[in-house]
């Protein structure tokens, strides 16, 4: 299986959301869609984008940048999912969307995620001005 994420911008290109789609990759490497795509972020005002995903066992982590959700420019947010035991392809949200960055002044961007184990992820990102040297 593979998970694809992308940003979908609305008509005025100011508001955008992060979407994901699960794919099955056959032996001959032909992808087929599993289920329907869905929006990952719950905060839908302004721009959400620059998403990254990682998987481990039955867990999938998604992280992204969100404009003004943390009160100051871009912040980093994440959501964990697990695959459904009832059938292949269904993703079930684990917990709620969480803010990753604790320093909120200025821009936090370019998140990257790796799953360390099921339900444990590590996320790294750029933080501008956090050390006050710009």
Q: Where are these predicted regions, by residue range?
A:
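Extracellular, repeat-based ectodomains that mediate carbohydrate processing or recognition
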Residues: 1-134
């Amino acid at each position: 299986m593979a998970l694809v994420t992308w940003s979908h911008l609305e008509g005025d290109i100011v508001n955008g959301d992060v979407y994901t789609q699960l794919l099955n990759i056959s032996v001959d490497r032909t992808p087929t869609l599993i289920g329907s795509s869905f929006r990952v972020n719950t905060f839908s005002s302004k721009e959400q984008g620059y998403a990254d995903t990682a998987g481990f066992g039955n867990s999938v982590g998604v992280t992204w940048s969100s404009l003004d959700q943390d009160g100051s420019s871009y912040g980093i947010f994440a959501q964990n999912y697990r695959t459904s035991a009832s059938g292949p392809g269904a993703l079930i949200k684990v917990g709620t969307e969480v803010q990753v960055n604790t320093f909120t002044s200025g821009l936090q961007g370019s998140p990257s995620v790796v799953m360390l184990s099921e339900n444990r992820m590590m996320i790294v990102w750029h933080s501008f001005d956090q050390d006050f040297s710009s």
